[in-house]
Amino acid sequence: LGDYLAEDELDGIRICREVVSHLNWRKKGPGATLPIDEPLYDQEELLGLVNEDLRVPFDIRDVIARTVDGSRFEEFKPLYGPTLVTGWASIHGYPIGIVGNNGPLLSEPSEKAAQFIQLCNQIDVPILFLHNITGYIVGTDFEQGGITKNGSKMINAVANSTVPHISIIVGASYGAGNYGMSGRAYGTRFTYIWPTAKIAVMGPKQMAGVMSIVQRAAAERRGIEFDEEADAKRAGIAEHWAEERSKGLFATSRVSDDGMIDPRDTRTVIAISLSICHNQDVAGTKEFGTWRM
């Protein structure tokens, strides 16, 4: 039995859209509550912000300014932990908290992120994570300074947060940094990537370097001469292998995200995602307080 007859697949999709448009669906969550203004900066410029070489830095605020309503961004603690940008804005009238990378994650930005994520839960605001992260900083000084403890605060806050998370990987998203920035494994409501995205346990050069260190140490333990030529060849193969498999196209082809998007469509994609999130009540967990510095 059927109520409609479609000529082909496209006609069937058209009929489905018409049926859905008359369902009179009402969202449980709040709708857009703030003024909807186009960004003051040209969204076409998003195409040139991220260099093909991800070692070339860029300011994540440039992405934010070309994405949010009226380019308005109320930054939270801008002078503390400046390698992580946090603050509030709106996209198509939907309030949103934003967490974006401007360098590696150290103790201070990790603490700032933990507090900000919990604040967003206190006021029931979804969070947008903009990834360009090589990971948490490592080294004796940083470890003695508490990076493990403070980094875990951020991951703890991400894991316990119940407001919708939307992640967009604009550059690198490596290792534990991916977890701290609410990667796919942390149940984000939506995850999108730009064509410039790279996702891996670590950068290709770093991985090849670690392999060389391990092989060199093994040769020393066995008391044999280390073959530099073979090591260079092996490292080159490993680096190429890791480079190809860290590309965004490789990841998205395996459905590890919700799609690769044109950077110029970022604002529209986020707005649609927020609208979907607001089909249900947007409620943050109130079971923990706000961590102070």
PLM regions: where:
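Ligand-binding clefts of soluble mixed alpha/beta catalytic domains
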Residues: L1-M293
